[in-house]
Amino acid sequence: MIIKNKEVKDILIKCGWQESRTANISHYLDWYKKYNFKPFDAVPDFLSCFGGLTLRIPSYRYMKRISSPKNNSDLELEVIVNPAFFITDDFSSEDIIESKQYAKDIGDFLGIENLIPVGSSSEYEEFFMGIN
């Protein structure tokens, strides 16, 4: 994948990414199948480029503000590109149903038919891809 923005590219490279990166995503595809998610074409492409990486994204707020954050952890957001954090092996069947409904509800709210989990943050935020 070609990233044209130098600042974004530098951040990705610091996190272990490279333009020629092609990660083995078979375990992610197995996970989607296990939980009956139907990823569209862009999802495997995205995971092939970024799957397994932990991205440390600088907080734009503190890049532009004069004041400093209360905690150094506020200086960046850590995003783990791994859909399997959305539903883990220790989830009960009720947890799985609730998680899948949560993804559907978000998609419905945003007007997105097929919302697919792709990662999470250290702050327990989920990241999705979708098409509309």
State the predicted function of each range.
Residues 1-125:
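A surface-exposed partner-binding patch
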Residues 126-132:
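Segments surrounding the PLD/"HKD" phosphodiesterase catalytic module and close analogs
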